Design a protein with these regions (language model features):
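N-terminal Lys/Arg-rich, disordered targeting/topogenic segments
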Residues: 1-15, 20
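Catalytic-site microenvironment of enzymes
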Residues: 15-16, 108, 127, 308
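Active-site-adjacent loops and short helices of periplasmic peptidoglycan-processing enzymes
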Residues: 39-42, 54-250, 259-260
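Hydrophobic single-pass membrane-insertion segments
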Residues: 29-43, 355
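Short, low-complexity, disordered segments immediately C-terminal to signal peptides
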Residues: 43-49
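Hydrophobic membrane-insertion alpha-helices, especially the h-region
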Residues: 17-31
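Eukaryotic PEST-like, Ser/Thr/Pro-rich intrinsically disordered regions enriched for SP/TP/PP repeats
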Residues: 8-9, 22, 37, 51-59
Length: 361
């Protein structure tokens, strides 16, 4: 698959507008800003100079001067897979704003500080952000040379699922399976992973597909307890809606930090697209559903290095975003977004505001 042509400036314009909204120079946006401690969002540099006005339309390409991209591709390295992750929600936050998404947290992993939270410990549905934990548990549950053969477990995949395009008889390696979970958010991959791993965990190849998937779900809940995500309970590997499959924004932040300890996950999370050849010889083209890392996307965020999106009618629009700047790692979780563009706009604004605060403190 060839890279897409770069779109002109839509993200740049919106991000500049977000910066000015953050400073209070412009009123009115998809979300209302009540206060941001000075200084606010750092100015963009365009052709070497700070951008000083809002442009509604630009016809010529705009060059943005930023730090070396390699710095943005560094990933978090704070997670110990066997250690509880503690996130304390304070009474007040450095970032104050009113957002339309229902459940939000911005967590500075490096300084162990919550910069913003909204209903962060309230019950929410994770949708496909579930696959962050699916991938971590999978890696720990199977030998690294496991061959995943797609089979009858495809019958468990709910109608209307996001898919990696797997067919019965396809054979994938463990790295390919992680990519199938993290890039196209394949529910087919999630069930092949869960059923294969469930039988390995139980040491019982005779388990039915449903029984094996249930074993894997049990292991996921054990992991949730181990990392301190005690307000979460998972029943399925793909995150398709189930009333008993739930989480909180704070718990999803813990899962993001936990996942940072797995190179297979962090390496997959920064891939924009991939053409993969299965062990069985078939090929597939996968695009990452996380548009923060697409440099051709309106939602592109230069410093992003992950992590996972999700959406169901019940969960709303969700994203667990990770980014690195100023030697700090941020996790921004949005669950219950009312629309896709609101999810992305609020994520971009929160990341910029978080790094602006970090820069000055």
């Amino acid at each position: 698959m060839k890279p897409k042509k770069r779109k002109k400036n839509k993200y740049i314009i919106r991000r500049v507008a977000a910066a000015f909204i953050g400073t209070g120079l412009i009123a009115g946006a998809a979300f209302a800003v009540s206060k941001i401690p000075a200084p606010s969002v750092p100015p963009l540099e365009i052709d070497g100079a700070a951008y000083s006005q809002i442009v509604t339309e630009v016809s010529a390409p705009v060059t943005v001067s930023l730090a070396p991209k390699e710095a943005a591709q560094q990933v978090m390295a704070y997670a110990d897979p066997s250690k509880e992750i503690k996130i304390t929600i304070p009474d007040s936050f450095p970032i104050e704003t009113s957002l339309r998404s229902g459940y939000v947290i911005v967590y500075d992993v490096t300084s162990d500080r919550v910069l913003f939270a909204k209903n962060a410990e309230s019950k929410a549905f994770p949708a496909s952000t579930t696959k962050i934990l699916t991938a971590a548990v999978l890696i720990d549950s199977v030998p690294p040379d496991t061959v995943f053969t797609v089979g009858t477990e495809l019958s468990l995949v709910p109608e209307g699922s996001s898919l990696a395009g797997l067919s019965k008889g396809n054979q994938l390696s463990l790295p390919q399976m992680i990519d199938a979970l993290m890039l196209p958010s394949g529910n087919d991959a999630a069930y092949t992973a869960a059923v294969t791993a469930g039988r390995i965990i139980a040491e019982d190849e005779t388990l039915s597909d449903k029984e094996a998937a249930a074993v894997f779900a049990g292991r996921m809940n054990e992991r949730l307890a181990a990392i301190g995500a005690r307000d979460s309970h998972f029943t399925v590997p793909d995150g398709f809606h189930d009333e008993n499959h739930y989480t909180t924004a704070a718990d999803m932040a813990k899962m993001a930090v936990h996942a940072s300890g797995y190179p297979l996950i962090t390496e997959a999370a920064v891939k924009e697209y991939e053409t993969v050849t299965f062990l069985s010889g078939e090929t597939a083209n996968w695009e990452n559903s996380n548009k923060l890392i697409w440099d051709t996307s309106d939602c592109y965020y230069y410093y992003a290095n992950g992590l996972k999106t999700g959406m169901t009618d019940e969960a709303g629009y969700c994203v667990v975003a990770t980014a690195r700047r100023f030697d700090h790692d941020l996790v921004c979780v949005i669950l219950g977004g009312p629309a896709s563009d609101i999810r992305w706009n609020e994520t971009l604004w929160l990341l910029d505001s978080g790094f602006a605060y970090i820069r000055e403190h």
